[in-house]
Amino acid sequence: MLTFWLAVATLSALALVAGAVLGFAARRFQVKTDPVAERIDALLPQSQCAQCGYPGCRPYAEAVAGGAPINKCVPGGEAVMLKIAAQLSVDPQPMDGEASSRPESRVAWIDEGNCIGCTKCIQACPVDAIVGATRAVHTVVSDLCTGCDLCVAPCPTNCIEMRPLAITPTSWKWDLRTIPITVIQQEQHV
């Protein structure tokens, strides 16, 4: 019985020392982050698509906090740019040429007859929208795909292409400014 309590005491002391060392290390080597970059990063869509010219959303947020243009986020579009402008109290900028000229709703499509199951597209996809296994046919989950094109280049058989998103009631972009509205005045009944 003495051996049992000795083992418990030894493990408890070891856990206490390890906890103290880890607590000290966490405070001593703490990485300080920019709170402005944190707020901007929270506004970005987190697709990590690199269409802005930065390797991901966090580096772009840090660059914007440092003064980079706020109009480079293609997946977020004008809505994200306006939120960033409001957050930083700066004037909104027109969308970048590449961001505005690109079709808004595109998804990757895999020709399953030519897919060899190499998994290079799965490794390139930043949002895990491609499913499949090694030497098996892959397919794209269109609800998750952001249309970033990063899966197209690594494909050795060129079986991936970007196609327009099929228009459904949930994906339709309603432009309420083009709907004619007629104001009907009701007659007063006494």
From Swiss-Prot:
The keyword Electron transport applies. It is an enzyme of class 7 (translocase). Gene3D superfamilies: 3.30.70.20, Electron transport complex subunit B, putative Fe-S cluster. It is found in: Cell inner membrane. Residues 32-90 form the 4Fe-4S domain. One of its GO terms (biological process) is electron transport chain. Its cofactor is [4Fe-4S] cluster. Residues 1-26 are annotated as: Hydrophobic. Part of a membrane-bound complex that couples electron transfer with translocation of ions across the membrane. This is Ion-translocating oxidoreductase complex subunit B. It comes from Sodalis glossinidius (strain morsitans).
